[in-house]
C-alpha cells in the first residue's frame, strides 16, 4: 500500500517536482 501511494503521489506531482532543482535532480525521469 505504501509503495502504491508513493507511486500515485509521484505521478500526480511529477511536473511540480521537476520544477524544483533539488527534486528534479533526485528524479531521473525529469531528465
Swiss-Prot record:
Keyword Secreted annotated: yes
Note: Negative results: does not show inhibition at neuronal alpha-4-beta-4, alpha-4-beta-2, alpha-6/alpha-3-beta-2-beta-3, alpha-3-beta-2, alpha-2-beta-2, alpha-9-alpha-10, alpha-7 nAChRs and muscle alpha-1-beta-1-delta-epsilon nAChR.
One GO location term (cellular component): extracellular region
Taxonomic superkingdom: Eukaryota
Tissue: Expressed by the venom duct.
Domain comment (free text): The cysteine framework is I (CC-C-C). Alpha4/6 pattern.
Subcellular localization(s) per the UniProt record: Secreted
Disulfide bonds: 17-23, 18-30
Keywords annotated in UniProt: Acetylcholine receptor inhibiting toxin, Amidation, Disulfide bond, Neurotoxin, Postsynaptic neurotoxin, Secreted, Toxin
The species this protein was found in: Conus lividus
UniProt propeptide residues: 1-15
GO function term, MF aspect, one: toxin activity
Record-given protein name: Alpha-conotoxin Li1.12
Amino acid at each position: 500500500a505504501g509503495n502504491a501511494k508513493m507511486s500515485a503521489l509521484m505521478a500526480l506531482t511529477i511536473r511540480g517536482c521537476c520544477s524544483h532543482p533539488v527534486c528534479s535532480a533526485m528524479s531521473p525521469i525529469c531528465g
